Amino acid sequence: GVRLVGSEMCIRDRARTRVSFETGFFKLGGHALYLGPNDIGIGKREAVKDIARVLSRYNDVIMARLFDHKHMIELSQSASVPVINGLTDYNHPCQIMADLLTIYEHMDSIENIKVVYVGDGNNIVNSWLNLASIVPLDFTCLCPEGFEPDSATVKMAKNTSFSNVEITHDVESGVLGADVIYTDVWASMGQKEEADERAKIFSNFQVNSKMMNSTNNCLLYTSDAADDTPCV
């Protein structure tokens, strides 16, 4: 059979990421080597290209969860084995693939589905926008002013001829007719000192029963951004 040895490099330490990927490696007949935040000083103690070359010699695949998206790009360019993007400050592609599968499981299709993201225009939103530039989507990002997603990524997604992409600050109209409501934490890693201030700014963007009255369905990533709404 195919030998599968995976190297996990998690600079942003998260239990769910480690468990899900290590379980996946195991079920595919391989095993994982975990390198935590203190094991590699990527871009500091160790050059990214050197890390990529060394790990490529010992492993069949590299899964990295990093702070800096530039490090992910350099890692993939320097490695001689496949590199899986487990998360960066710019995007989170594996999460979105899992979300699409969840939507499909509950709705039997991803066609003609309106997805509304409510909250901070962060790496999750960038991933949805990247997806909208590849496959047809009806996607709305509902966020406070000043918390919009990456402008270049928005432009790229809007320039497609097959996706409907909207960025809005109007809560009432933004969620109207939504089939899927998606939310995330208001203060991501590295922003915890802003948590109290963000809680005030995002208070009107909390997913709750009042908001859900204008939608067709509910799908939530539960956090402080969600209150009393039942999840699918």
Residue ranges and their predicted role:
Residues 1-6, 11, 221-232:
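Single conserved hydrophobic/aromatic residue that forms the stacking wall/gate
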Residues 4, 56, 76, 174-176, ...:
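A short, aliphatic-rich alpha-helical micro-motif
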Residues 5, 28, 78-80, 135, ...:
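Short, structured coil segments at secondary-structure junctions
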Residues 7, 12-104:
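Phosphate/diphosphate ligand-binding glycine-rich loop within oxidoreductases
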Residues 15-23, 111-161, 166-173, 177, ...:
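Glycine-rich phosphate/diphosphate-binding loop of Rossmann-like nucleotide-binding domains
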Residues 72, 125, 190-191:
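Glycine/Thr-rich phosphate-binding loops of Rossmann-like dinucleotide-binding domains
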Residues 106-109:
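Glycine-rich helix-loop-beta junction characteristic of Rossmann-like nucleotide cofactor-binding loops
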Residues 158-223:
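Rossmann-like adenosine-cofactor binding region
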